[in-house]
Every structure is written in structure tokens, then in C-alpha cells.
């Protein structure tokens, strides 16, 4: 993945901004910083833009400059709407985004936790090394959540993690820095949020629940809300 395009999605009026220490761990991506403002029923984008547009644009420019200072090319845009999931999906499809970053409070990018659901996305997880600077990483741990009703769930999960770890090693990541854990639980979002304690970044593969499910709520945003850990969703 050469110069992957990362959508950095922040919400106004109080956006969470990636810290300088966190950004130092990124390696050669292009960033698209999008600020989203939720319109209440009856509220118009024109009214909000007239009242706060210049203020929000200045904040977005400052965020983009923070990326630029760390060697990450960045553009920015401000969008309005009543559905942030639909807005995010539209941008992802329009701009062929490779990954989505939901910023959190991490000040470094040394410990990364990668959630792995199946063997099929192992190579996509390995593409993490094209976004995160390997030299900054202290550990890249893998986690799989097994179905408690599946008698072979844990053993299957161990196999998935082993193959994912092998893929990471094949692309140059030191095997000694990789740890593997299988958790068992019916609530995947809860199990992953528990596993994310103490990490600087949580990496997920794309699912409808991460990018737009309004019924159960996106897993990525649940983890961010519970742990304030940044989440990177790989497509």
C-alpha cells in the first residue's frame, strides 16, 4: 500500500485531535481530515456555516498542519449532516479511502492491538506496516474473539492468530514483538474494548458495524468511547 489515504474523522464543535507524539508514529500516509458537524432537526448547514464556518475551518487547518509538520500530507474539509455514519461512508467510497482513523487520547504509538476475525484478512492487517512506522513500535499484539457457543472457537482462533502473525513476520516485523490472545465472549465490542486497555492504537478490519450500523453501534466507536484509544479501521 504505497502512500495509503487515511480519513481522519473528527466531530465538531469539540473535535478530538491526534497528539503530536501519536502522529510521529505514522509512516508516509496521505491524510484527509474531515470535520463533521451534526445538524439538529430544522437546523440548516448554511446557518451553521455562517455562524461558525470560519472558526471550524481554522481548527481543521490547524489539525492538518499538525500532520504536515510530521511529514504527512494532509487536506481538510468540513461537512454537515444529520447522520455521521452516512457522511463517513460517502467520503470513504468517493475518495477510495484505505483506512479510517478515529482519534483518541494516546500520546505515543508504541503498542498496537490488532483484532483479527479470520484468515482471509491477514494480508490486509499486514498493510498496517505501511501506515504505522515500524521503528516506533514496541509491540503489535493480536487478539481474536471466539464465539462461546462454538466448541472449536478457541482452537480456530489460535490458528487464525498464528497465520496472521506469520504474515506480519513475512513482511518484516520481528516475531518477538508479536503476542497472541484468544478471548471468548458473545459481545465482540465489549471483549475488544477490554482487550484494548493500555494500548496506543486499536486496529480493526472493515465491517458494516464499524462504518455504518445504526442498530448495534459501530465497534470502533464503542472502543473509542470506552477506552479513549484511537481506532484505525482498515478497508
Predicted regions and their residues:
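Short, ordered loop/turn segments at secondary-structure junctions
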Residues: 37-41, 79-81, 104-106, 144-148, ...
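Gly/Ser-rich helix-loop-strand patches that form or flank binding pockets
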Residues: 81-133, 196-235
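A short, acidic, amphipathic alpha-helical segment used as a generic capping/interface helix at domain edges
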Residues: 164-167, 184-196
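Charged helix-capping and loop-helix junction motifs
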Residues: 53, 158-162, 216-220
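Small/aliphatic-rich secondary-structure junction motif
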Residues: 1-47, 111-155, 166-174, 178, ...
Amino acid at each position: 500500500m504505497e502512500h495509503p489515504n487515511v480519513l481522519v474523522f473528527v466531530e465538531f464543535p469539540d473535535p478530538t485531535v491526534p497528539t503530536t507524539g501519536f502522529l510521529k508514529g505514522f509512516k508516509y500516509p496521505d491524510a484527509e481530515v474531515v470535520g463533521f458537524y451534526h445538524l439538529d432537526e430544522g437546523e440548516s448547514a448554511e446557518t451553521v456555516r455562517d455562524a461558525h464556518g470560519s472558526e471550524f475551518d481554522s481548527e481543521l487547518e490547524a489539525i492538518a498542519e499538525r500532520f504536515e509538520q510530521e511529514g504527512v500530507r494532509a487536506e481538510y474539509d468540513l461537512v454537515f449532516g444529520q447522520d455521521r455514519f452516512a457522511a463517513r461512508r460517502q467520503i470513504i467510497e468517493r475518495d477510495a479511502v484505505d483506512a479510517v482513523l478515529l482519534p483518541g487520547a494516546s500520546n505515543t504509538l508504541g503498542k498496537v492491538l490488532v483484532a483479527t476475525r479470520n484468515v482471509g484478512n491477514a494480508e490486509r492487517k499486514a498493510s498496517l506496516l505501511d501506515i504505522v512506522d515500524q521503528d516506533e513500535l514496541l509491540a503489535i499484539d493480536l487478539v481474536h474473539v471466539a464465539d462461546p457457543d462454538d466448541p472449536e472457537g478457541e482452537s480456530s482462533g489460535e490458528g487464525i492468530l498464528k497465520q496472521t502473525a506469520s504474515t506480519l513476520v513475512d513482511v518484516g516485523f520481528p516475531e518477538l514483538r508479536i503476542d497472541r490472545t484468544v478471548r471468548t465472549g458473545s459481545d465482540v465490542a465489549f471483549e475488544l474494548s477490554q482487550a484494548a486497555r493500555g494500548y496506543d492504537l486499536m486496529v480493526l478490519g472493515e465491517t458494516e458495524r464499524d462504518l455504518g450500523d445504526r442498530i448495534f453501534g459501530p465497534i470502533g466507536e464503542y472502543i473509542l468511547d470506552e477506552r479513549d484509544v484511537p481506532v484505525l479501521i482498515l478497508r
